[in-house]
UniProtKB/Swiss-Prot annotation:
One of its GO terms (molecular function) is structural constituent of ribosome. It comes from Salinispora arenicola (strain CNS-205). GO terms for cellular component: cytosolic large ribosomal subunit. CDD domains: Ribosomal_L30. HAMAP family: Ribosomal_uL30_B (MF_01371_B). Keywords: Ribonucleoprotein, Ribosomal protein. InterPro entries: Ribo_uL30_ferredoxin-like_sf, Ribosomal_uL30_bac-type, Ribosomal_uL30_ferredoxin-like. Part of the 50S ribosomal subunit. One of its GO terms (biological process) is translation. Belongs to the universal ribosomal protein uL30 family. It comes from the Bacteria. This is Large ribosomal subunit protein uL30.
Amino acid sequence: MARLKVTQVRSEIGTKRNQRDSLRSLGLKRINDVVVKEDRPEIRGMIFTVNHLVKVEEVE
């Protein structure tokens, strides 16, 4: 299964509560934090919620 590398590139200050919750659920706390997650629908949904705050890359 593919994996996604998610990097937080913008601050969560001034964002809505659900966006902050999605960042925390992804394991992102501050700018330039990086996590690698499995490519699953629930992860894609969280990424879609915060797509303006993160950068996503596929990794092997």
